[in-house]
Amino acid sequence: IMKDQLLKALVLNEHVRLYIVRTTDLVQEAQDRFDLHPCACAALGRTLSVASMMGAMLKSEEEMLSITINGHGPIGSIVVDAYANGNVCGFVSNPHVEDVLIRPGKLNVGAVVGTDGTLTVTKDLSMEENFSGSVELQSGEIGDDFAYYFTLSEQTPTAVSCGVLIGTDGRVASAGAMILQMLP
């Protein structure tokens, strides 16, 4: 049985930082705990997956970050906290949001998240003031929005891919994410 894991690497002569995370168990736990409908599960699962990698980017165990995504869509807000040890926790305002499909079998996460709003990351780096960065949502599909956040708010060109596959039985078949970042 595959277990959730996070891998970090420097590639291309240490010019690119790579994070890959498998989060199937984590996302299934969230679905069970909050009785998430598929679109809500995909939205929260993608955010939890990216957040776990962002937590791993923190420098010390005392640091943590909070992510809030609110596109004024039917799902409401997605709120996730991430810690340096890889632990994450989060919730969505409306776990029973009605599913929207792009085509049969393909969830339209952007439609339930919405795009009329922001993605905000607040980092508690154990200093007097927290660092906070906020960007307008690009697609509501989560990955694009985080890529835009890293590029704009942290001035780090970044590619983000994340996904949650809900099986025909309604349970999480697979979940994970990847972050590629250009280093200065």
Place the predicted regions along the sequence by residue.
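Interaction interfaces in information-processing and related assembly proteins
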Residues: M2-P184
